Amino acid sequence: MNKDNTPFDRSALASYFLEFLVIGHRGAAGLAPENTLPSFRKALDMGCQGVELDVHAVNDASGEQQLVVIHDDTVDRTTNGRGPVSLHTIEQIAELDAGDGNRIPRLAEVTALAAGYIADTQPLINIELKGKGTAAPTARFLRTHPGLAVLVSSFNHEELAAFRETDKTTPVAPLFERARGNMLETATQLGASCINMSTRMAKPSLIEQCREAGMPVLVYTVNQLHETQRLKAMGVAGVFTDRPDNLIPVIAR
C-alpha cells in the first residue's frame, strides 16, 4: 500500500505508464482457475505489474452488499454451482468450487494479496465493474481501503459514470470491444485516465490518435509474444494476458 495512504489518482497511475505493463487477466487465467487467489498469486509471482479482475455484488445474510470476484453473470461456467451470481448470498458463494478446490474470492481477499507483495511499486489492480449496481459498493470499498493502486474499468459506461459520480479520484478506464461512438469523447466525459480496448481495435492510427490526446491505451487479451511486441512498438501502454509466462521473460528484459 502507499506508505502514507494518500489517494491513488491520475498522477499516481501515470507513474505506472513509464514502463510497458503486463497485467494478469483474471490473474493468470491460462495457467490457473480464473479469478481465484492462486491465479492472482501466480501472475504476480511471474512478474506482472498488475492484475485484472471482475466484480459482482451479492448480499450477505444481513442484506449487506459484498463484492465477489467472478467474471460471468452466472456461476455455471467457472464453478460447480448453477444460476445467476446475483441470486446467491455471500455464504452460498463461499461454498462453491471455482476450480481445483478454490473458492470465489471476495474483492478484499485479492486486494490484500496484491497489497502484501514486496516490490518497488505495488501491483496495479484493475477492477472491472461487471455486474449491474457494482459502482456504489466498489466506491464504498475503496473509501474503506485507502492506499490501494486501483484502476476501475467497465464496458457499461453508465455504471462507470455512476462510479465517477461517487468517487472523483480513483482512475477509471472505459472498456471497448468494438468501435462505438467517439471513444476519446467518452473517455474525456468520464474523466478517464486511460482506455482499455480489444486487440482487434488496436490499429496504429487509433493508437496514435489516443497518444496525441494524452490517453494511454491498454489492450486485451494478448497471449503471444509477437503480438505483444507489435503492440508495444505501436505505442500501447500495456497488455492484459492470460499467459504471463509467454511474455514476461522477454518483455521484462
Predicted features and spans:
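Phosphate-group recognition and catalysis centered on beta-loop-alpha active-site segments
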Residues: 1-253
